[in-house]
């Protein structure tokens, strides 16, 4: 790829060399929940129970990332037991819920994991995510993110939140790091 501005064709769509270079160095992937791991809809039952749908392809991608030595963390503005349960199922141990200021959790993660901001990717869908996204090495907005977030992100997924966008990002990181063919996940 010697032409300036040329893109790498992936199974999801084109990816710029600039994004691939940033993705090579990612050691921590931080995800929002509503609108990223889920489609952003919240179903409320008659007894106050909250339901969300999670995509198993995203789960497989997360497991592949974790088994390929990429840490995965969740920072979300809401608090829900089902998110805690989903994280436990996937093996995500870094969970921050009820975060109105996501920078506090971000700083805690950097210190706890001894990771520099340039080695972090963050996937978000709304303006609450931008303060962290502007500090990381690779900022990602899902395809159906808030219109003001999309032009600010380093990469915009080709797939919407809750529909496999996280799997797309996991595959991108693994491809950039030469680990995609050996990655092992689990359909959960």
Curated annotation (Swiss-Prot):
Q: Which residues form the signal peptide?
A: none
One Pfam family it belongs to: Hydrolase_3
Answer whether the UniProt record assigns the keyword Secreted to this protein: no
User: Its family?
Assistant: Belongs to the KdsC family.
Q: What EC number(s) is this enzyme filed under?
A: 3.1.3.45
Q: What are the alphabetically sorted keywords of the record?
A: Hydrolase, Lipopolysaccharide biosynthesis, Magnesium, Metal-binding
Q: Which GO terms describe its molecular function?
A: 3-deoxy-manno-octulosonate-8-phosphatase activity; metal ion binding
Assembly and partners are described as:
Homotetramer.
Tell me which PANTHER family the record gives: HAD SUPERFAMILY MEMBERS CMAS AND KDSC, N-ACYLNEURAMINATE CYTIDYLYLTRANSFERASE-RELATED
Q: Note the SS bond partners.
A: none
Q: What cofactor requirement does the entry state?
A: Mg(2+)
Q: Which gene encodes it?
A: kdsC
Say which species the protein is native to: Salmonella typhimurium (strain LT2 / SGSC1412 / ATCC 700720)
Recorded catalytic reaction(s): these are:
3-deoxy-alpha-D-manno-2-octulosonate-8-phosphate + H2O = 3-deoxy-alpha-D-manno-oct-2-ulosonate + phosphate
Name of the molecule in the record = 3-deoxy-D-manno-octulosonate 8-phosphate phosphatase KdsC
Record: residues binding substrate: 34, 55-59, 63, 78, 86, 102
Q: Which residues bind Mg(2+)?
A: 32, 34, 125
Q: Origin, by domain of life? A: Bacteria
InterPro entries this protein is in? CMP-NeuNAc_synthase, HAD-like_sf, HAD_sf, KdsC_fam
């Amino acid at each position: 790829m010697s032409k300036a501005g040329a893109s790498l064709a992936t199974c999801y769509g084109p990816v710029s060399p600039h994004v691939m270079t940033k993705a090579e160095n990612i050691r921590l992937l931080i995800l929002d929940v509503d609108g990223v791991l889920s489609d952003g809809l919240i179903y409320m039952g008659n007894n106050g129970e909250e339901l969300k749908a999670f995509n198993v392809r995203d789960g497989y991608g997360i497991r592949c990332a974790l088994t390929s030595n990429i840490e995965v963390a969740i920072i979300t503005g809401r608090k829900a037991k089902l998110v805690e349960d989903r994280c436990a199922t996937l093996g995500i141990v870094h969970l921050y819920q009820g975060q109105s200021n996501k920078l506090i959790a971000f700083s805690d993660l950097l210190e706890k994991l001894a990771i520099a901001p340039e080695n972090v990717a963050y996937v978000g869908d709304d303006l609450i995510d931008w303060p962290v996204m502007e500090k990381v090495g690779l900022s990602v907005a899902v395809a159906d993110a808030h219109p003001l977030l999309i032009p600010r992100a380093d990469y915009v997924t080709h797939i919407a939140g809750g529909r496999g966008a996280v799997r797309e990002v996991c595959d991108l990181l693994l491809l950039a790091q030469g680990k995609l063919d050996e990655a092992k996940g689990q359909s959960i």
